[in-house]
């Protein structure tokens, strides 16, 4: 983006002492959040939360040191958005896995400071002929990011047409831990899951999840909070979900 673009973004959406817009890694446009509770960096490409750290604490969101930052390329780490489908496309093998939302630009439509001092940004996906060729449905996607005592991310789709549509979406979040082999994950006990390392077989979780090798699973019908117990960083990360 040009300096004029940043000037316009900051004039309309910056919050003094909390939020501004600037070139980030690889020249990607980013929103930089620094408030009394936490710091965060969000790329406008993909409305992608790249980093989030509570004040005076290690990062909670992991960003790979080998991440590539380039227009149209997915960023390894952070919180990539999967939209409007999850996994491979149902009929078109040439379409990107997990959709295109994480590699296209999103526009800022609103910023605000909440009563507790948290910072909230609302992004809307920018669609063009290329995205409409893959997703020819009248719809809008919004990503609402709130950085405060907790990180809250809300993905919403609005059907702007008259026909019903079916979407798949997810946050493909990467969490920062000291040593994954020492971590335990609570809250998924008795949940069925698909084990993609074992050919997609359906299995059931017994007790906490531990990781000592390759793990690739899709847990089904999980509504409880999930706790990542990390003794190396002496903390627990709570993952809550709604919707």
Task: Spell out what each predicted region is.
Residues 1-76, 224-225, 230-243:
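Beta-strand-rich N-terminal accessory domains
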Residues 25, 95-147:
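Extended, loop-rich substrate-binding clefts of extracytoplasmic carbohydrate-active enzymes
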Residues 25-27, 36, 100-105, 137-139, ...:
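Residues that act as N-cap/strand-start positions at coil-to-secondary-structure junctions
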Residues 31, 40, 121-123, 141-143, ...:
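Hydrophobic residues positioned within well-ordered beta-strands of beta-sheet architectures
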Residues 42, 155-161:
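Asparagine-centered strand-capping/turn motif at beta-strand->loop junctions
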Residues 60-114, 123-124:
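Extended, compositionally biased flexible segments
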Residues 127-129, 145-149, 159-161, 173-177:
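Beta-strand elements of well-folded, non-transmembrane domains
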Residues 164-166, 170-243:
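Active-site/ligand-binding surface loops and adjacent short beta/alpha elements
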């Amino acid at each position: 983006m040009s300096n004029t673009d940043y000037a316009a973004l900051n004039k309309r959406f910056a919050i003094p002492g909390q939020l501004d817009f600037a070139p980030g890694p690889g020249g990607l446009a980013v929103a930089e959040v620094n408030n009394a509770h936490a710091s965060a960096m969000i790329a406008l490409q993909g409305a992608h939360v790249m980093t989030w750290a509570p004040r005076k604490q290690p990062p909670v969101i992991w960003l790979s040191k080998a991440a590539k930052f380039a227009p149209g390329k997915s960023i390894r780490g952070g919180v990539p958005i999967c939209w409007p489908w999850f996994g491979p496309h149902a009929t078109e093998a040439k379409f990107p896995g997990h959709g295109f939302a994480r590699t296209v630009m999103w526009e800022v439509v609103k910023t605000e400071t909440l009563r507790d001092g948290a910072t909230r940004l609302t992004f809307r996906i920018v669609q063009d002929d290329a995205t409409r060729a893959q997703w020819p449905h009248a719809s809008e996607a919004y990503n609402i990011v709130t950085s405060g005592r907790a990180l809250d991310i809300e993905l919403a789709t609005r059907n702007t047409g008259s026909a019903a549509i079916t979407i798949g979406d997810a946050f493909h979040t990467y969490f920062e831990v000291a040593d994954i082999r020492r971590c335990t994950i609570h809250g998924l006990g008795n949940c069925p899951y698909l084990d993609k390392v074992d050919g997609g077989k359906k299995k059931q979780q017994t007790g906490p999840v531990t990781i000592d090798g390759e793990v690739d699973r899709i847990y089904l019908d999980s509504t409880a909070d999930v706790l990542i117990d990390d003794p190396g960083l002496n903390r627990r990360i709570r993952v809550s979900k709604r919707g």
